[in-house]
Structure formats: C-alpha cells, structure tokens
Amino acid sequence: MILILLGPPGIGKGTQAAVLSDLLKLQHVATGDIFRKNFQENTPLGKESKKFINKGLLVPDEITNQMIADYLSQIVPHSNFLLDGFPRNVFQAQFLETFFTKSNLHLNKVIYFNAFKQDLMKRIEGRRICSHCGKVYHLDNLPPKIEGICDKDQKKLIQREDDKPNTFLKRLKVFNQETLHLVEYYRSKKQLFEVDGMQNIQQVTQKILKVLETEQK
C-alpha cells in the first residue's frame, strides 16, 4: 500500500502519519527527514539544497525530486510506504507518477486534511515540540504529562519558529499558491479522499481506515 498525505501546515499530518504507519505497517517517508539525512551525510544534493535554504529560497523541484527518488529507490522492494511532505506541487506529482510507473508501484490513495484558516491559527498557537527528539505536543489537545517537558526524553518543549504567527501565515500562503492546485490534480484523477483535519486524532484515523478498507474490498 502507498499513501500520500496532503494538508496545510499545522493540520497534524505528522501525527496522523505516525499513527497510520504504525497501524498499517507502512514505512513513514517524511521529506524533512530525507533532507536532514542528505545534510548530515553531506551528499551533493544536500550541499546543493543548502545553498538555496541558506538564502531563504525554496529548493528547486529538480533537486527535491532527485533526492526523493534516490531515497524511494532504496525502499521500493518493500513497496509499502506513506509519503508526508511530498509532492508539494503538480510538477512534483507528475514526476512521482512517472517514478511509480517505472518502478511498477501503485498509489492507493491521497488523503487531504482540510481546515479553515482561523482554526489552523488556533491549533498552531498551542503546538510545541521536543527540542531533542522532535515529538509533537499540543497544549490543549495533546499535552505532556509534565508541563513544558517531553514525556519521551524529559527534554524541554519549544515553539518552532515555523509555528510563530507571522512565519506560519507565510507558510500558509505558499501552501495555498502551490499545493491547492495539487489537491485539484488528484481530485481529477479520483485518487483524493478529503477529511476534516480539525477533528480529534482518533476520529480522523478511523475515517481514513474506513475509506481504505472500502477501497480494498
């Protein structure tokens, strides 16, 4: 099974990705992790990406596509994975489609988490992450056992720069400019399943599992 998760920043894709990958025994492929791996290993693609990131620019599609393809090529024999953070636009989606065809892979479903801007703003204000392991919490919906401290490794929780209001609004603008076209692209291919991303974690998970179960019958 291959799934793609789409949705605006702050919607909780990472949380759902972790839950679904565990329940469905899928490998969680997160774009951010792939970039970090390339940075740490100082690969040619990692070096090239850093040039753009250090200037505050988006990494060109060609570099991102190649980085993702290189990584996916290593896990193709398993062919059960969930993509979180890729594709971000139609060009990347078309590249991925070609890669899947060449690799004899089948995309089962694209899950799109939708939400209103004001609801996202409220959710993002309460989001905190562990400064060490990256585990995500929410002050209202998913608080740590001890205020300000990670349950997993007892490190300090922080608010990411990306989650601060001004930065978040910029990220949302980029999403609306690029990724909304991608939603329509997958909708036209009848591959899209839309879910209200503002429901609680369990409700969202159950709706996704139900539609996947129906698809497989």
Curated annotation (Swiss-Prot):
Keywords: ATP-binding, Cytoplasm, Kinase, Metal-binding, Nucleotide biosynthesis, Nucleotide-binding, Transferase, Zinc
Pfam family, one: ADK
EC number: 2.7.4.3
Reaction(s) this enzyme catalyzes, per UniProt: AMP + ATP = 2 ADP
SUPFAM superfamilies linked: P-loop containing nucleoside triphosphate hydrolases
Main location: cytoplasm
EC category name: transferase
Positions with a binding annotation for ATP: 10-15, 127, 136-137, 199
GO biological process annotation, one example: AMP salvage
Listed pathway(s): Purine metabolism; AMP biosynthesis via salvage pathway; AMP from ADP: step 1/1
Protein residues bound to AMP: 31, 36, 57-59, 85-88, 92, 160, 171
Region (LID): 126-163
Entry-linked InterPro entries: Adenyl_kin_sub, Adenylat/UMP-CMP_kin, Adenylat_kinase_CS, Adenylate_kinase_lid-dom, P-loop_NTPase
Residues reported to bind Zn(2+): 130, 133, 150, 153
GO CC, alphabetical: cytoplasm
Subunit structure: Monomer.
Stored NCBIfam families: adk, PRK00279.1-2, PRK00279.1-3
Biological function: Catalyzes the reversible transfer of the terminal phosphate group between ATP and AMP. Plays an important role in cellular energy homeostasis and in adenine nucleotide metabolism.
Domain notes: Consists of three domains, a large central CORE domain and two small peripheral domains, NMPbind and LID, which undergo movements during catalysis. The LID domain closes over the site of phosphoryl transfer upon ATP binding. Assembling and dissambling the active center during each catalytic cycle provides an effective means to prevent ATP hydrolysis. Some bacteria have evolved a zinc-coordinating structure that stabilizes the LID domain.
Family that this chain belongs to: Belongs to the adenylate kinase family.
Protein name from the UniProt record: Adenylate kinase
Organism: Phytoplasma australiense
